[in-house]
Amino acid sequence: NAFAAVELIHPGTRANPEYYDGPIWGPSAGPGHLGKDYSELDQETIDYIVERFGDAAEMAKLGGVDIVMIHAGHGWLLHQFLSPLNNRRTDKYGGSLENRARITMEVIANIREKCGDDFPIEVRMSGTEIVEGGLTLEDQIEFAKLLDGKVDLIHVTSGTFPVPSTNQHMIPNGFLPQGCNVYLAEAIKK
């Protein structure tokens, strides 16, 4: 028997203005990578996003999906909050790793509230951003400790879309050694 899974994601600053002409949001304001600047998320919009993740998981469950995966890696919104490269906030969503992880933890809690404790949740994370000043393996080990007991599966890769040289680690190709991200998963699993 195969299991059906759905990936839940918000692009944050990676939203493409060619396909989306609404506001582009990130943890902090800044210049957009595709020519459209982005704004810092306010509390009301953060709450809205958290609720929509929960609603999407609930719809997936009602539709017969067996597990949801929250994408908190590769430079998407939840990862942007985690990354010191993107998150320059000074409120409860910035500064310490625990604060930068807060939105992801709120998403998980919202999904648990709407789908129950028996509905499996996977979190996909970058074990390291592979870029100076970015998330390190040590940071992500601490993030995994926050996830422990709250999710059912942690999926570890590496890299971040905003830094193209790391893309081959997100989707390993034939030029990298087989299992190139396994050392990250092993360290996080400990």
Per-region residue spans from a language model:
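Flavin-dependent oxidoreductase catalytic cores
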Residues: 1-190
